[in-house]
Amino acid sequence: EEKEPNSITYVALGDSICAGIGLTTVQYAHNLMGVDVSFNFKGYPEACYVGQVGKSLNLDRDHAINLGLPGVMSKDMVELVKTGTMAEMNTLSGCQYNYPEFVDYIKSADVISIQLGSNDAFVPTVVSFGEATNWKSEDLASIVLSGNLRGSSKETEDALNESLKKLSLTRSEKDAVWNLFFSGMNKICENAYPESSSNLRQIVATVKELNPDAQILIIGATNPVPLLPSWSNYFSTVSYT
């Protein structure tokens, strides 16, 4: 049964998954604070999940708003839902967003989805991996961001191993990488979970204050590399808690 056109307003809060990063038609511009994705609020690709939800509900771009922000961590969104601004740059992710219209979009919504938590573990891991390899790992980070390592098949494992071989690491760099894989990433995920959970509660509370009548949907976090046990445990916990 076809829905009545524009019967509700849907607003999606989230990170690069929400924004549709990885799809070739995502549009954004670089600026002094990182990237400007304001065009993507309504100009997002139809293939991203906001586009698919909007299409299924018969909503136009004024009634299906995509507030996905690449690199955003949950602590950043705590600020953004309150004022639409980040007081300072997130030095780990290298992003700083300033969109006062955020608050107005939240107030006008009938349904609000929240997809966050991935970057709370992913960003510190990418930074730690970069430091361990003296930043030879940027190509591997790009592969992770592309989504090509999201499977758990033998082909995915081979792709990960092949990417690691291409880094041409020194002995000390290899030792640092193995330490990160076997202990450092566990610590990163252990630290990320309580912070992510606490921040999500604050975000939901603020959204309810701004718009007590809106329906709020929490969307599970996406694990970019299921082959890594520490990440699998983290993302399973975040998605089902």
Q: Where are each of the predicted segments found?
A:
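Conserved, well-ordered alpha-helix/loop/beta-strand core segments that scaffold catalytic motifs
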Residues: 215-236
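A structural motif corresponding to the C-terminal end of an alpha-helix
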Residues: 52-62, 199-218
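Structural recognition of the beta-strand scaffold that forms the well-ordered cores
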Residues: 9-14, 18-19, 64-68, 111-115, ...
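Flexible, glycine-rich phosphate/dinucleotide-binding loops
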Residues: 19, 73, 225
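Short amphipathic alpha-helices and their capping/turn segments at secondary-structure boundaries
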Residues: 1-9, 91-112, 202-213
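Conserved small/polar residues in nucleotide/adenosyl-binding loops
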Residues: 241
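Conserved SGNH/GDSL esterase-like catalytic core that processes O-acyl groups on lipids
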Residues: 26-194, 198
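Short glycine/serine- and acidic-residue-enriched loop/turn motifs that recur at repeat junctions
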Residues: 20-26
